[in-house]
Swiss-Prot record:
Places the protein is found: Cytoplasm
Cofactor: a divalent metal cation
Reactions catalysed: a ribonucleoside 5'-phosphate + H2O = a ribonucleoside + phosphate
Keyword Nucleotide-binding listed: yes
Record GO terms (molecular function): 3'-nucleotidase activity; 5'-nucleotidase activity; exopolyphosphatase activity; metal ion binding; nucleotide binding
Entry coiled-coil feature ranges: none
Protein's name according to its UniProt entry: 5'-nucleotidase SurE
Binding-site positions, a divalent metal cation: D17, D18, S48, N104
Enzyme Commission code: 3.1.3.5
Encoding gene, per UniProt annotation: surE
Its biological purpose: Nucleotidase that shows phosphatase activity on nucleoside 5'-monophosphates.
Predominant location category: cytoplasm
CC terms in the record's Gene Ontology section: cytoplasm
Pfam families xrefs: SurE
Length: 261
């Protein structure tokens, strides 16, 4: 039987991009159950790297599920994007006090933020006027992830954000290192980027198809002030991210050479 929400406890909406059956979202939701009344709304299949896409050309299915391992926590699966999950969760289940996304299988550092579905779910929460946090876990290189330390820290950080709040239009992007964290660093977004490569093959009928592959690169891998540098050094990276992407330092310079209409 689904536990009823308590009027004395904060409401927490948990989403992700790895899908509702991901071990990361299960670890996060169960840890946050000690903080508030948790409801899970996640994609029914993996939606990694879809960015902040919103589905507007077809209807969406929003279904309760009891088979994803969340125990008494209410959980819903959506045949849409991570941002869709937040939109539907907020509008169909009521406004939460906090939106949390993750824990992602793999880091979201530097330029990853621009295509991360995990971060996009937090951005959608922020766009709806709700404090939001995205959590991601670095892998050990062998395709394995440990969420114990990250989930415990996520609960502590959620308590702090619920108590103190966040500045308007600012979310937190949090990344956990593969091993036991050495500490926590407040960081800036680094220059960690993905260099694409295309693998071209042919199907049995000779028709060409392509895989987008690539390799991550970091221009500032040893800068301790960046998200990438902190995680590589074994620290939890907590990065405040603004929804406003304006390059304010260039406003005056552009006015000097942008032509009039």
């Amino acid at each position: 039987m689904t536990a009823l929400p308590s009027p004395d406890r904060p409401r927490i909406l948990v989403a992700n991009d790895d899908g509702i059956f991901s071990p990361g979202i299960k670890a996060l939701a169960l840890a946050l159950a000690d903080v508030g009344d948790v409801v899970v709304v996640a994609p029914d299949v993996e939606q990694s790297a879809v960015g902040h896409g919103i589905t507007i050309r077809r209807p969406l299915r929003f279904k309760h599920t009891a088979s994803a391992g969340f125990g008494t926590l209410p959980a819903y699966r959506v045949d849409g994007t991570p941002a869709d999950c937040v939109v539907l969760g907020v509008h169909l289940l009521g406004r939460p006090d906090l939106v949390v996304s993750g824990i992602n299988l793999g880091s979201n550092l530097g330029d990853d933020l621009t295509h991360s579905g995990t971060v996009a779910a937090a951005i959608e929460g922020l766009a709806l006027g709700l404090p939001s946090i995205a959590f991601s876990q670095q892998g050990n290189g062998g395709g394995e992830y440990s969420f114990t330390a990250g989930a415990a820290y996520a609960a502590r950080l959620a308590r702090a954000v619920l108590a103190k709040g966040l500045p308007p239009r600012v979310l937190l992007n949090v990344n956990f290192p593969a091993g036991l964290p050495r500490g926590v660093r407040i960081t800036k977004v680094g220059e960690h980027r993905w260099e694409d490569s295309i693998i071209t093959r042919h199907d049995p009928e000779g028709r060409e198809y392509h895989w987008v592959a690539g390799q991550s690169r970091a221009a500032d891998a040893h800068d301790p002030d960046t998200d990438y540098g902190a995680v590589q050094a074994g620290y939890v990276s907590v990065t405040p991210v603004r929804l406003d992407l304006t390059a304010r330092d260039l406003l005056g310079e552009l006015a000097g050479y942008v032509p009039e209409i």
